[in-house]
Structures are given as C-alpha cells and as structure tokens.
Amino acid sequence: MSAKEVKFGVNARDRMLRGVDILANAVQVTLGPKGRNVVLDKSFGAPRITKDGVAVAKEIELDDKFENMGAQMVREVASKAADAAGDGTTTATVLAAAIVREGAKSVAAGMNPMDLKRGIDLAVEAVVADLQKNSKKVTSNDEIAQVGAISANGDQEIGKFLADAVKKVGNEGVITVEEAKSLETELDVVEGMQFDRGYISPYFVTNADKMRVEMDDAYILINEKKLSSLNELLPLLEAVVQTGKPLVIVAEDVEGEALATLVVNRLRGGLKVAAVKAPGFGDRRKAMLQDIAILTGGQAISEDLGIKLENVTLNMLGRAKKVMIDKENTTIVNGAGKKADIEARVAQIKAQIEETTSDYDREKLQERLAKLAGGVAVIRVGGATEVEVKERKDRVDDAMHATRAAVEEGIVPGGGVALLRASEQLKGLRTENDDQKTGVEIVRKALSWPARQIAINAGEDGSIVVGKVLDNEQYSFGFDAQTGEYSNLVSKGIIDPAKVVRIAVQNASSVAGLLITTEAMVAELPKKATAGPAMPAAPGMGGMDF
C-alpha cells in the first residue's frame, strides 16, 4: 500500500475550496443566454466546443490531489443534476460553489459545521416548498416550446421541434436525439410500436423499391420458441389462407424447413407471409412479446402457459391495420388490442419503473412504456461541421430533458428569479440556534448567485441587477439578459422547469454540506520520478565519436 498524505482543518478546506473554485469558474461562464462557450481538448479528433455545464465539469481533472477532491465533489453535483433532471447542471454547480465558499468562511470563524449543515437543510426544505407552491402547470404547446428554447440557450427552432415531438408522441412517448447526415434538423415520428428486428429473409419483401415488407390488415402470430418445422402450424396456416389476409410470424427464430416452406409459399403467392425474430433476450423477450400480444389483441404462444402450436386458432392471433418490416426494424401500427388492457399494461410497467433500482432496467422499461403508450419521435440534428452538430446535439439533449421536467412538475420564472424570490422567504425562518441561522443565511446568499452570474455573463453588474429584481415585488419580474431589459419573464417565455431548479438546489446543498463538514483529507503522495537504468550500448558501437 502506497504512503498517504493527510491534511486537517483549514489547510484541508482551503485546498479543497481552490479545486471547487477552479471547476465552478470554468462551468459558470456557460450560464444564461449570453454565456460563453468552453473548448475541450480531445485526445483524438477535433476539440469539442460546448455550453453544456456537465460536459465541461466531466473534463476537469486537477494535478493537486486535494484540489481535485473538491473539484470532483462539485462535478458530482453536475452529474447528479444531469441524471435526475437532464438540465440545470450549471445552476447546480454555481449554487454548490457559493454555499461551500460562504460555509468555509463561517467554519473558519469558529461556527459548528454540523449546525451550519442543519441550517442549510432547513433552508433547502423551505426553498423546495416555495418552488412547489409557485410552480405553474404546463398546458400549451407554446409553453413547451419556450422551455425547450430557453434550455437550448435561446434557440427557438429547437424549442419548436421539441414541442412538436411531445405533441405527437405524448408525455410518455420516447424522444431520441441523433446526428443527421444533412445540414437540416428534422423530426421523424414513428407511430405505433417499433422494435429493432427486421425480416429473416429478403424473399418476404413486398415493396422492392424500398426493400421492405408492407402488409395491411394482417394477422400476427406471437411465438416464444424457434420454428424449425411447420407440421404443427399447418391447420393454422390453412385457416389464414382461407381469410385471404397476410400473416406476420414473430418467433425466437424461423429456420431450416420452416423458413424454406414459408418462402416458397410467399413466392408462389399462396400465402402472404413474413417472419421476424422476437425482440430482446431472456425474460425481457417474454415481456416484450406479451406487450406485442396486448397491443394487437392476440395471445403470446408459450409453453409456460401450456399452449401448444397445434392448438392455436385464428382468434389467438393478434391483428394490426398495418405492419411494416425493413432490414432492421418492424413497426406495428394500429394494433387491435383493447384500450383497457393496454392501459393496465402501461400502469404495470410504470409501477416497475418506480420500483427498479437499476438505471439500465429503468431505461428499458421506459422504452417499453413509450412503445405501448405513445410512439417514438427521433430528432435528427444537422449542421455544417461535425463540431457544430455535436454542440447542437448537446443543447437538444438538455432541452429535451427540460421539457420533460416541465411537463412533470410545472414551470417557474427563469433567469434565476425563482431562486431569488425563494431567498426572500428564508428571512423569517425559525432555527434552534445562531449557527443554524447562519446556515440559512449561507443558502440565502447563495440563491442570488445564478441570477448574478447570468447578469455578469451578459456584461452587467450582478449586484445591481439582483437589487433591482428584489425591489419589485411582482413574482415573475426579472432581468432578460438577452435584451438587457427588466420585465415579466413568464409572459416573455423566460421560464425554467420547477423540477430542474428543485434538483439543482437539493444536489448543490447536499454536496456543499458534506464539504463544509469535512475536517480531514487523505490522498496518495505524488510518486517521485526515478531515473531508469542507462541504456546498454548496442554491439558494434564502441569507438564511435559524435
């Protein structure tokens, strides 16, 4: 085990505070509509230009171990804000740095760190209650577009794309962001359920121009096992032929004789048929097949349920108005499932999302939920260069999470104003002792920093801007950094999702409280560089003069 260096008290906190300030100073320049870009060096490829606070924070690694510990703790604030709300990372970082800065002064003045932390926690509870009381539900498409535009640093086009996406797939639908191959940004919406499995054989293709299978008013057989022989299925296939309708087979695999027979029948025109592999693996596959069954009003054929293929009848098959299958994806539109059954399945998946502790499982469950409940919207972000596309994609990602958060918990005035108003509510907050009161005061001062920093980035005096906003008692009155005017921010569309602001405050105070109550720090001693042994002379080099 290598030797460690230990620092205590003021010495430890000072080094840690230096690291916090370095990270916060790099991140806070991106805040607000007039925030600047940060250029990140990459070990390969072109440098990355971004205004995304968490992307900047993740790049910072300091040489001094003690400074780096402080920086990494605040980086954690940005990461947690990004994970929980997808936005508000810069605000959370600015708040955390402000609380740590003020808290360190109070500890140095001899106050009890644990009482300070208790005061900070009391203040945060009051701030969260104030945000929830004053948040306004998002109802119109315009409000969603405004939230998206603000989060994308004032880009109205991105806001409009997001509002359209939410309108088309609903609040439960999945919105994914990809890089486009062209200059233009575009929105593509997939209605119905889509899963990432294509046709097993290209001989099933019905539209040769687009190389895809298109079937209208189709039956769907949902089978959990492999199909290698069609003997058990013959009665069912004959019944389907009698109806004159096409059949889509979803199974673990279709191979050998079964595949050959289906292809021959398809080519001869006796049976309109296509086969695709079932999506997912293991238990997830069973669940997804059950989803497809519920969506199409059919039954998943599984030996677990005691159903054998030879006993399957037409009324056990699913139905859909349209099925499209290309090389990579299968889309089922307008399944014949009962609305009540689909809603019950959606409620069941939502309950599983609440209970799961795995991020991966949660993501997969949300994908399943979206496929059942809404659909999938894909925003393809375009740009002139790769660097521009990546920077824009970062902003679209932020904006997408912000719009989701706004729909969940409503909106509050933007520009740091909601936090300024909440800070006024802390003035009369009752505490048990003076040190706790100082903890509340630390949060009260810190809450003005986001508004102050937005003004500074816009070239204004932060203190004057904060003073003018607080002089006006109207809740939504604030400073529009884009135009340099004071006005009602909500009516101008300058709004923040209440969830984003709440999570920024909670995460910032949580990590800052831990930093304030730190009394000792332990880090590895830097390794001393040792000179390696001299390189031996190569044979035949003796007597050479240079």
Curated annotation (Swiss-Prot):
Keywords (A to Z) from UniProt: ATP-binding, Chaperone, Cytoplasm, Isomerase, Nucleotide-binding
Q: Which reaction does it catalyse?
A: ATP + H2O + a folded polypeptide = ADP + phosphate + an unfolded polypeptide
Presence of the UniProt keyword Iron in the record: no
* Subcellular localization, as worded in the UniProt entry: Cytoplasm
What induces or represses its expression, per the UniProt entry?
A: By NifA.
Q: Tell me a GO cellular component.
A: GroEL-GroES complex
Its EC number(s): 5.6.1.7
For this UniProt entry, what is the primary localization, expressed as one broad class? cytoplasm
| UniProt superkingdom | Bacteria
PROSITE patterns, alphabetically? Answer: CHAPERONINS_CPN60
Q: Which GO terms describe its molecular function?
A: ATP binding; ATP-dependent protein folding chaperone; isomerase activity; unfolded protein binding
The entry's ATP-binding residues are 30-33, 51, 87-91, 415, 496
Give GO BP annotations, semicolon-separated. chaperone cofactor-dependent protein refolding; protein refolding; response to heat
Give the family this protein belongs to, as stated in its UniProt record: Belongs to the chaperonin (HSP60) family.
Q: What does this protein do?
A: Together with its co-chaperonin GroES, plays an essential role in assisting protein folding. The GroEL-GroES system forms a nano-cage that allows encapsulation of the non-native substrate proteins and provides a physical environment optimized to promote and accelerate protein folding.
Subunit comment:
Forms a cylinder of 14 subunits composed of two heptameric rings stacked back-to-back. Interacts with the co-chaperonin GroES.
Q: What is this protein called?
A: Chaperonin GroEL 3
Q: Which organism is it from?
A: Bradyrhizobium diazoefficiens (strain JCM 10833 / BCRC 13528 / IAM 13628 / NBRC 14792 / USDA 110)
